[in-house]
């Protein structure tokens, strides 16, 4: 009995010291009449209560969970607004009674305050803590973000605006790197129109370089996995550049080298319409069974030679199989899904998923509602995970990652911006994926392919 009492005393003494440790979840308790009682319940659950008495405490603290007894907060409206905003922006698991709380976390059971059961909050807080620890110990990347399309609206990597992507939101979501996209709508393929597309693409790439260059203390451009890792070690975010639509190559293969010199790491061969390189998977194309043109084969060969990844996210099935056949290097799908889960033309069927794995490539799963299921408005993070889990089951854990397509149509309940990406890690843990697999999902797999593609180019 004395030993048990002594052990309890040790736990009581050391628990506050462990609050910022690797293992003990920290749960925020707002300044309310019942906070002492709440704190005792949290301690009994094996967590550490963080008393939040001022708005400074709210802004300065990183929690793993929070209690939100609506209407009980002492400090008034401003304090409450800050408290709820911190929870919403940082995706903190919580339990509460307000309408706002239900909107923030639709899965949480809403009970009258005196009947609140803390077990679910504690479980979520512990999983959230594990997710943070994992993501903070690896290089994490989202491989498709269309933020540059919003430059005219004032979007910028260094500003927290209405965009789904920014350095600030990356920090909240524990994301280290992102691929920013120079996107081109498909136009006529005559020589003059193609040259205009080339010029527009190069101009957009320069705009990305300029935007990232505005914030040297926050981020930098990366052309290789090693450069991204170096930026992470410096405490800065890494941005790669991708091009969506080979229309930007024009009719001159020399433009591929120009793009590589500027830092482009992958090119999506086409978009929603056929072009001079290949046919599209979209219904707007002429025939999805058709693949690479003769010029398209030359493009694939030159991309291999320059060390630029071939992205098959929009091309037709015929193009997919042609690239599997003709490319000397692994290929990628930077933002795609599983056709077996929902039969949209943007998804890959199981035969393609298996071939992608045999090729050594990777599929990065998107968050675009209309590609995930029939009801756009009701799609959630669970629908995204259904595609993700199927891809893992068919292709293997070494060949799957995340390519959200944020600011380009991506975003569902629970995963609607860089700040929400940690929620995917929580879902991965709940599904039972191992830390090693999760490291692969969040960057290891994609970076492996990038290294191999660049290595093959250097050997040639």
Residues covered by each model-derived region:
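Active-site core of metal-dependent hydrolases
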Residues: 269-279, 284-353, 364-369
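Conserved phosphotransfer microenvironments
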Residues: 35, 68-85
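Positively charged n-region of N-terminal signal peptides that target proteins for export
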Residues: 1-4
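N-terminal hydrophobic targeting/anchoring segments and the immediately downstream early-domain regions
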Residues: 122-286, 343-402, 406-460
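A short, well-structured beta->alpha microelement
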Residues: 43-58, 116, 221-229
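Bacterial N-terminal signal peptides
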Residues: 7-16
